[in-house]
Regions:
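Phosphate-/nucleic-acid-contacting segments
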Residues: 2, 187-254
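Cyclic nucleotide-binding regulatory module and flanking cytosolic helices
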Residues: 8, 14-62, 101, 106-107, ...
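Cyclic-nucleotide recognition modules
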Residues: 47, 97-157, 161
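Short beta-strand segments in beta-sandwich/barrel cores
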Residues: 56, 65, 83-88, 106, ...
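Short phosphate-coordinating micro-motif centered on Lys-Gly-acidic
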Residues: 66-71
Length: 254
């Protein structure tokens, strides 16, 4: 009994739920893991001054949002582990997929510049870690830091370059190519089980994200099934030939 209580207290000290950007996320009080990600991605070299005291590690569980459209962003996020999908909410109530984020990706750089609310939704598709810094601290210590501003400028430039690509994907690429890219991006780490393809509700959401109809999505899934790329095991779709999907997907949504 004493051992159980001891382990509970240790876990409680390491993982503390906090409210971040309106969401209940998990703050990870693990300096070793935090320092690992800082070192892995050289986050301490982004700034001319030492910003490590202001860095924290947070964890998002699968399907939680890092940010939502219209919400104020108070932190600069560095996605250091996991994958997230970026999509916009349209005036007709539907959503449209833009891309997928993988490490290292900066989130909140646009809002840092324009001091405004988020204009897109970012939802993790697997458990993810982010190193976060309060924007208040960045504006206090790094607003005139040329090294940091150069890094942010590069990040914004990269996003601007990709905007034209994202905007043309739904117009120029057939659904089969876009679906193949989506399936690869949302697959589990061993490229077997496909996340989010478990019921009609998820398929409806996916059809909206890919800018197509529910029926067209089903027809295209059946085409991939006939080609031997995927199979359906009860309510779960599985990838059985990654190469077929990779040939179709190219670098869409990357």
């Amino acid at each position: 009994m004493t051992f159980v209580i001891l382990m509970y207290n240790i876990i409680r000290k390491i993982y503390i739920k906090i409210i971040l950007e309106g969401n209940c996320v998990i703050k990870v009080n693990d300096n070793e893991k935090l320092n690992y990600y800082i070192s892995k991605y050289n986050l301490d070299e982004i700034f001319s001054i030492d910003m490590k005291p202001h860095m924290e590690l947070v964890m998002f569980n699968k399907n939680e949002h890092i940010c939502k459209s219209g919400e104020t962003i108070s932190y600069l996020f560095f996605l250091v582990h996991g994958k997230a999908k970026v999509y916009i909410s349209l005036s007709n109530g539907k959503s449209l997929l833009l891309c997928f984020n993988k490490p290292l990706k900066v989130i909140g750089d646009v809002e840092f510049i324009k001091i405004d609310t988020a204009d897109s939704n970012i939802q993790v598709i697997e458990n993810a870690y982010c190193v976060v810094i309060p924007l208040e601290k960045i504006r206090q210590y790094a607003l005139d830091d040329s090294k940091f501003l150069r890094y942010i400028s590069n990040s914004l430039g990269e996003k601007l370059t990709k905007i034209s690509k994202y905007s043309s994907i739904n117009l120029l690429y057939p659904l089969e190519n876009r679906l193949a890219s989506y399936l690869l991006a949302t697959a589990s780490s061993d490229n077997s089980e496909i996340s989010g393809l478990t019921n009609d509700c998820n398929l409806t959401e996916m059809s909206e994200l890919l800018g197509t109809s529910y029926r067209h999505l089903l027809r295209t899934l059946n085409k991939l099934y006939d080609r031997g790329a995927i199979k359906k095991n009860k309510d779960i779709y599985e990838i059985i030939d990654v190469r077929i999907l990779e040939d179709l997907a190219g670098d869409l949504y990357e």
